[in-house]
């Protein structure tokens, strides 16, 4: 379970203090799959980074399975797998297999556990044919698949994805969605931001909408369509579409 209590995060700009996340309080239950919606700069990634113990909140408390993200970061990171948009965390001079072996060791897996996890993940994501090739020569989509496998190498109970299907072709995106459905059946807790409405509808139990750092909606996507925030939802996805074709 993930709990945020009165959480804010401020950044010092050259001329002013920017409040990226504002007074957020919410709870995400075990096994819940939650989509995070919001325009660029709304605070989605900042909130995910705080949950992952990669950023400290300026105020408030965040706990992951009862562990404080500031006071007990090691315990938090052991329970969470993370993938942030544009940041694969991979080493270009190492092969895909070597990258996964390295991160497996960082998480304390033994040799047999690492081998089994790599075999499983490479099969699921169709990566067997290029596991022994250096990541530096991969396409964006291939790198993204290895990065997803890297986030899952230690079989975490909680997974945070920031636009996880960015760079993937349709086939790979569908494989990813099928894998998320399996993780749901395994009662994994998943948070991911996305600008793909079909993806959110297909995978999420509920959604969080963020605007200017504030959580302005938390609940079922179907109810959001009927709420006063439906215009905000249309803005988010239409603005993304316009940027994509301009």
Curated annotation (Swiss-Prot):
It holds the Pfam family ABC_tran. It is an enzyme of class 7 (translocase). Its EC number is 7.2.2.4. It comes from the Bacteria. Residues 2-237 form the ABC transporter domain. Induction: Induced by ethanol and the protonophore carbonylcyanide p-chlorophenylhydrazone (CCCP) and, more modestly, by sodium and potassium. Positively regulated by the two-component regulatory system NatK/NatR. One of its GO terms (molecular function) is ATP hydrolysis activity. It catalyses: Na(+)(in) + ATP + H2O = Na(+)(out) + ADP + phosphate + H(+). Coiled coil: none annotated. ATP binds at residues 38-45. Keywords: ATP-binding, Ion transport, Nucleotide-binding, Sodium, Sodium transport, Translocase, Transport. CDD domains: ABC_NatA_sodium_exporter (cd03266). InterPro entries: AAA+_ATPase, ABC_transporter-like_ATP-bd, ABC_transporter-like_CS, ABC_transporter_ATP-binding, P-loop_NTPase. The complex is composed of NatA and NatB. Belongs to the ABC transporter superfamily. Part of an ABC transporter that catalyzes ATP-dependent electrogenic sodium extrusion. This is ABC transporter ATP-binding protein NatA. The lineage of its organism: Bacteria, Bacillati, Bacillota, Bacilli, Bacillales.
């Amino acid at each position: 379970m993930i709990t945020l209590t009165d959480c804010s995060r401020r950044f010092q700009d050259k001329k002013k203090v920017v409040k990226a996340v504002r007074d957020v309080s919410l709870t995400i239950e075990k096994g819940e799959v939650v989509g995070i919606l919001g325009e660029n700069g709304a605070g989605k990634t900042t909130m995910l980074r705080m949950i992952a113990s990669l950023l400290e909140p300026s105020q408030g408390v965040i706990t992951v399975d009862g562990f404080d993200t500031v006071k007990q970061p090691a315990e938090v990171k052991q329970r969470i797998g993370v993938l942030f948009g544009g940041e694969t965390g991979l080493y270009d001079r190492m092969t895909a297999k070597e990258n996964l072996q390295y991160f497996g060791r960082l998480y304390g897996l033994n040799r047999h556990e690492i081998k089994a996890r790599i075999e499983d993940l490479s099969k699921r994501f169709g990566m067997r044919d290029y596991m022994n090739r250096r990541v530096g020569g991969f396409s964006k989509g291939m790198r993204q698949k290895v990065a997803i496998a890297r986030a899952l190498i230690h079989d975490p109970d909680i997974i945070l994805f920031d636009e996880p299907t960015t760079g993937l072709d349709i086939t790979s995106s569908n494989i990813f969605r099928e894998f998320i459905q399996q993780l749901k059946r395994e009662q994994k807790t998943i948070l991911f931001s996305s600008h793909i409405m079909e993806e959110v509808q297909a995978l999420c139990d509920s959604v969080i909408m963020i605007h200017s750092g504030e959580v302005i909606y938390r609940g079922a996507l179907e109810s959001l369509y009927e709420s006063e925030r439906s215009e905000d939802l249309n803005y988010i996805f239409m603005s993304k579409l316009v940027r994509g074709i301009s």
